[in-house]
């Protein structure tokens, strides 16, 4: 079984590293001026993957902070997965052609499943991750500004049938709250789809990571960690030490 992977997160807005609370653009804290410097620090601490989100792109519905993502992928010895503002075949090709390991489709997976299936067929389920950001079980889109009538599990099952291998599940109510992840909902999605699910939102302690890691046999393949690292709840080194 593949090992449980920790993904330190870098959320970018105006070229800076920021964190939002529950995706609220008005509740922003800036943690650094350079995504590259932040990524370098994560890589030096042993990260194998870095999760990068283009918040400007998510809102504007087009790529905005892409040059920072490409710099990290090409100049550091890490795998990068990126989400935010990826809407077109050209966006996907732009990133994958420049050494980014995995592209996350979020809003477009809800709004245009046919396109998403086409991209899964073209690039395969390891390169195209499906980002399911849920509010009370329903998928939210457009930088979380809108909630759809689509259930996360239903969409997950449909896309799994068409080649999706990796899902990233975010419980919006937990994001940036340091309140602990919604392990139950993540396991439920993994069981419904039979695929790997990466947990995102709410990780606040090494105990939270242990709880997720203990569900590895149930399909939880990793965890994205953001605010907990930036507010020094624990170090990335400590989190990676237990990675297995």
UniProtKB/Swiss-Prot annotation:
For the biological process aspect of GO, one term held by this record is:
L-histidine biosynthetic process
Report which reactions are catalysed by this protein.
1-(5-phospho-beta-D-ribosyl)-5-[(5-phospho-beta-D-ribosylamino)methylideneamino]imidazole-4-carboxamide = 5-[(5-phospho-1-deoxy-D-ribulos-1-ylimino)methylamino]-1-(5-phospho-beta-D-ribosyl)imidazole-4-carboxamide
Q: What keywords appear on the UniProt entry?
A: Amino-acid biosynthesis, Cytoplasm, Histidine biosynthesis, Isomerase
Can you list the GO cellular component terms from the UniProt entry? cytoplasm
Pathway participation: Amino-acid biosynthesis; L-histidine biosynthesis; L-histidine from 5-phospho-alpha-D-ribose 1-diphosphate: step 4/9
Q: Where in the cell is it found?
A: Cytoplasm
Sorted alphabetically, which InterPro entries does this protein's record hold?
Aldolase_TIM, His_biosynth, HisA_bact_arch, Isoase_HisA-like, Isoase_HisA-like_bact, RibuloseP-bd_barrel
Q: Which residues form a coiled coil?
A: none
Enzyme category, top tier: isomerase
Enzyme active site: 11 (proton acceptor), 133 (proton donor)
Q: Which GO terms describe its molecular function?
A: 1-(5-phosphoribosyl)-5-[(5-phosphoribosylamino)methylideneamino]imidazole-4-carboxamide isomerase activity
Tell me any Pfam family this protein matches.
Answer: His_biosynth
In short, the EC number is: 5.3.1.16
Family per UniProt?
Answer: Belongs to the HisA/HisF family.
**Name of the molecule in the record:** 1-(5-phosphoribosyl)-5-[(5-phosphoribosylamino)methylideneamino] imidazole-4-carboxamide isomerase
Q: What is the lineage of its organism?
A: Bacteria, Bacillati, Bacillota, Bacilli, Bacillales
């Amino acid at each position: 079984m593949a090992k449980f992977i920790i993904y330190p997160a870098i959320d970018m807005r105006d070229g800076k590293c920021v964190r939002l609370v529950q995706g609220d653009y008005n509740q922003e804290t800036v943690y650094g001026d350079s995504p590259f410097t932040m990524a370098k620090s994560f890589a030096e601490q042993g990260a194998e993957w870095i999760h990068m989100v283009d918040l400007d792109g998510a809102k504007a519905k087009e790529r905005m902070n892409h040059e920072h993502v490409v710099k990290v992928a090409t100049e550091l010895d890490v795998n990068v997965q990126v989400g935010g503002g990826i809407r077109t075949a050209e966006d996907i090709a732009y990133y994958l052609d420049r050494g980014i390991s995995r592209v996350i489709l979020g809003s477009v997976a809800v709004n245009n499943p046919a396109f998403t299936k086409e991209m899964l067929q073209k690039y395969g389920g390891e390169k195209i991750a499906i980002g399911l950001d849920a509010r009370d079980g329903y998928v939210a889109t457009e930088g979380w500004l809108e909630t759809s009538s689509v259930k996360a599990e239903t969409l997950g099952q449909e896309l799994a049938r068409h080649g999706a291998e990796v899902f990233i599940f975010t419980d919006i109510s937990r994001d940036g709250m340091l309140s602990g992840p919604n392990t139950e909902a993540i396991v439920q999605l993994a069981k419904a789809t039979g695929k790997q699910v990466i947990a995102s939102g709410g990780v606040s302690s090494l105990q939270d990571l242990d709880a997720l890691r203990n569900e590895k046999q149930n399909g939880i393949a990793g965890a994205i960690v953001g605010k907990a690292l930036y507010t020094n709840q624990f170090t990335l080194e400590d989190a990676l030490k237990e990675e297995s």
